[in-house]
């Protein structure tokens, strides 16, 4: 296979995370590659987009596709990745050994004479660092969950206290209403008794007056 080498692309450091972006132009079936030294455990995550030139403008076309390969040049060009994407997609690769790796990109389109533009954005970091970051994020998340749980427990206790106060107030209100009702009935009975006594007294008084 004939390779056209893209020089001067620095996409990563051996341990720290880095981001690199590049684009190149090619015809259908034309392969372009670059080389990069990777350390064991380096994780590559790439965002890939392919555009087709139409009337002077580069546009996405679902009929186009992009093949990505990764070879270990230090191990007799052992191929460790061979992936075919549509006109847009991503790629993920973890270096199994330390050494020079060759990254190759081959765009395909039905019209062979069309000019294709490949846009590549790669993010490369160390798996252990990413795992550590995940653990930190997980611990932070657990801490926040714990705080929310404590807050929820506190809110529930406040709600229970409010319910108890409401129940106590309701009982006091019912007791007061009961006493008021009892006292009102008692007063009404006294009033009725008084009225009955006065009516009887007046009746007897008028009877005596009539007799006299």
Swiss-Prot record:
Q: What is this protein called?
A: Protein ERP5
Q: Where does the record place the GOLD domain?
A: 31-124
Where does this one sit in the cell? Endoplasmic reticulum membrane
Extract the signal peptide range: 1-20
Q: What does this protein do?
A: Involved in vesicular protein trafficking.
Which GO BP terms apply? endoplasmic reticulum to Golgi vesicle-mediated transport; Golgi organization; intracellular protein transport; vesicle-mediated transport
Coiled coil feature spans = none
Q: Report keywords, A-Z.
A: Endoplasmic reticulum, ER-Golgi transport, Glycoprotein, Membrane, Protein transport, Signal, Transmembrane, Transmembrane helix, Transport
Family that this chain belongs to:
Belongs to the EMP24/GP25L family.
Q: What is its main location?
A: endoplasmic reticulum
Q: Which residues cross the membrane?
A: 179-199
Q: What gene does this protein come from?
A: ERP5
Q: Where, in residue ranges, is this chain on the Lumenal side? A: 21-178
| Residue ranges annotated as Cytoplasmic topological domain | 200-212
Glycosites: 171
Q: Which GO terms describe its cellular component?
A: COPII-coated ER to Golgi transport vesicle; endoplasmic reticulum; endoplasmic reticulum membrane; endoplasmic reticulum-Golgi intermediate compartment; Golgi apparatus; membrane
Pfam families under this entry? EMP24_GP25L
Q: Does the keyword Transmembrane helix apply?
A: yes
Q: Please report the record's description of how this protein sits within the membrane.
A: Single-pass type I membrane protein
């Amino acid at each position: 296979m004939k390779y056209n080498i893209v020089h001067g692309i620095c996409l990563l450091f051996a341990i720290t995370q880095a981001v690199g972006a590049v684009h190149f132009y090619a015809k259908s079936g034309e392969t372009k590659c670059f080389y990069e030294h990777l350390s064991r455990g380096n994780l590559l995550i790439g965002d890939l987009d392919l555009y087709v030139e139409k009337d002077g403008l580069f546009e996405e076309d679902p009929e186009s596709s992009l093949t990505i390969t990764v070879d270990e040049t230090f191990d007799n060009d052992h191929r460790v990745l061979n992936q075919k994407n549509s006109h847009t997609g991503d790629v993920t690769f973890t270096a199994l050994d330390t050494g020079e790796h060759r990254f190759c990109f081959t765009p395909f389109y039905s019209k062979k004479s069309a000019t294709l533009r490949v846009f590549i954005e790669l993010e490369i970091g160390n798996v252990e660092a990413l795992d550590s970051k995940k653990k930190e994020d997980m611990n932070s998340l657990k801490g926040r969950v714990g705080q929310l749980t404590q807050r929820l427990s506190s809110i529930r206790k406040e709600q229970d206290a409010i319910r108890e106060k409401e129940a106590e107030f309701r009982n006091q209100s019912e007791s007061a209403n009961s006493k008021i009702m009892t006292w009102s009935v008692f007063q009404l009975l006294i009033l009725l008794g008084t009225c009955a006594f006065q009516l009887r007294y007046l009746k007897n008084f008028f009877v005596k007056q009539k007799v006299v």
